[in-house]
Amino acid sequence: MKVVVKKKDNSIPLEITTEFIKLQDAMKYANVVYSGGEAKVLIQEGQVQVNGEVCTMRGRKLRPGDTFTFDGSVYAITEKP
């Protein structure tokens, strides 16, 4: 008997119209922070993951296909058609 397990994608899509978006801007766009200053602190404290790894660079460029995780929620960067 063959068992196939598929990971359910529960990510929240964030559509962008540009080539990339900076991590702190993506956090503001997703309404997970109120200001860039708040995003800066959370990122520098290591509370944000990009593509499954802790990221402390607030200027990190996220492109379509990238994800960031904060407070248990996963946000997927997608390209607006």
Q: Each predicted region: which residue ranges?
A:
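Ferredoxin-like alpha/beta domains used as RNA- or RNAP-binding modules
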Residues: 1-30, 54-81
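Generic non-transmembrane alpha-helix signal with a bias for helix starts/N-cap capping motifs
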Residues: 20, 35-36
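Short, well-ordered loop/turn sites that connect or cap secondary structure elements
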Residues: 33, 42-43, 62
